[in-house]
């Protein structure tokens, strides 16, 4: 009887220790994260789904910046789930495209988070509206940190989705972190490439780059004198008559009821002028050729930005492609016929290939 009593006490002690350790770990995570003032009302640019549960969460990156996210969980889910971290477009917030993707994928059985990158939206970080190829790649890695310790997530089945400029960040994250088992980049921008070369290499001479560097250096001096950062302005509004068609597409999303959000830089006064300076000297896709995990690049046939995905595909596979879908090993480029860049931001055109995304992740997160 005494032996049985001792065994029960030992088991109770072990359970209490495990419980205390779990609570201690949770408290440590909370202590490392800043308390954010998060909006609790549904303020997305898309309707809430009855098929998923939603709540706000926060987590921190290794620079001490606390990131705000929306978590979407399939209703009545049980056991450990495959998980996805979603972010983008560049200059958007989680209430826009990334949240839409995250909610759709949660309807299909994944636990998902859509997060605001550092310095934007409801996430912390000063100065506001600045970007970094390092820190914004780190944001994805921090999301993986967070997901990997959730009780209802299988840490061996975590993937990421990057949209627009965060497509490039997602590919960079996949090259850096083997915990990421599968990656989707949708309507991708390579923010390093566009900053250093301009669109279609229109600013790709040493002289043009030097002029950019001089302008950014002068703006830094001016900002320091003023004690504030000059904003570049968001999407042009009102539109000039001669605006390129892709700028009109951006306007139709960011500046109208369709996609406007009060915390979105693109919907309002944009990034700091100097906010993207470091992209000029830090190319995102340097090590894309060493990515071992599966990557799916999705792009519209008519998108002005299609060449970014084609370039990324070539960096990963060594195969040059123009305007057609292609698969080499576990790397795939999917071209959506007739689709523009912004068509992949929301469901208005009905061309986001959710079935393909579901199949891709279910095949590779197992």
Task: Please state what every model-predicted region is.
Residues 104-124:
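Conserved alpha/beta-hydrolase
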Residues 291, 297-299:
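Short beta-strand/loop motif that positions the catalytic acidic residue
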Residues 91-103, 117:
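The serine-hydrolase catalytic nucleophile loop
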Residues 94, 120-155, 159, 347-353:
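Catalytic nucleophile-loop/oxyanion-hole region of alpha/beta-hydrolase
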